[in-house]
Regions:
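Acidic-basic catalytic patches of nuclease active cores, encompassing PD-(D/E)XK
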Residues: 40-82
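Surface-exposed cleft-lining segments at the edges of enzyme active sites
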Residues: 31-39
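N-terminal signal-anchor transmembrane alpha helix of single-pass membrane proteins
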Residues: 1-29
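Short low-complexity, flexible loop/linker segments enriched in glycine and/or proline
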Residues: 77, 155-160
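Basic, amphipathic alpha-helical patches used to engage nucleic acids or provide basic targeting signals
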Residues: 94, 101-155
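Active-site metal-binding core of divalent-cation-utilizing nuclease and nuclease-like domains
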Residues: 64-107
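Surface-exposed alpha-helical segments enriched in charged/polar residues
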Residues: 50-54, 131, 159
């Protein structure tokens, strides 16, 4: 009886090992359809980034496409509430984040608003984002996409947020 048990156990372990090896080989040899983007930012975002860098670059750090889930944390709460609130920010990001150069403290979020921000669903999303930033006491500055930006005016608008 013990001999049959050991034979069965050996075959069982070999079967599990074979499954693991096959799964590993499938993953190792898998082809994924992902392609590298030519640029992280859209043309409008890139133009705005370089203007921001020109007026702020020596004094602040400028990050792009920062996930809100990396900006904000939730205090201790029950799991249901945690997932409810976490899901609201999980896949959202802000276009730019201005941070203190010394300690990388977030100072100001910037949203570059194009025509898509006029759509009903986008307005609702923007209102939610604005409310989250307000409650977290992190200012958010919305600016319309433009072919060009007056650097002095833009700097004054940003300074109005006390950075």
């Amino acid at each position: 009886m013990l001999k049959i048990y050991l034979i069965f156990l050996t075959f069982f372990i070999l079967a599990i090992l074979a499954i693991v090896v096959i799964a590993f080989l499938k993953i190792k040899n898998a082809k994924f359809p992902y392609m590298k983007k030519e640029c992280l930012l859209s043309e409008a975002e890139r133009k705005f980034y370089f203007v921001l860098f020109e007026i702020l670059g020596n004094n602040y750090l400028i990050f792009s496409k920062v996930r809100m889930a990396d900006l904000f944390y939730l205090p201790k709460m029950n799991n249901s509430d945690f997932y409810h609130y976490q899901n609201k920010i999980q896949s959202k990001h802000v276009d730019f984040l201005i941070c203190d150069k010394e300690n990388i403290k977030p100072l100001l979020a910037i949203e570059l608003d194009d025509s898509s921000h006029l759509k009903i669903d986008r307005i609702s999303r923007d209102n939610l984002v604005d409310k989250i930033f307000e409650n977290a006491k992190l200012p958010i500055f919305r600016i319309k996409v433009s072919a060009s930006y007056n650097k002095e005016n833009l700097l004054n608008q940003i300074r109005a947020f006390a950075i």
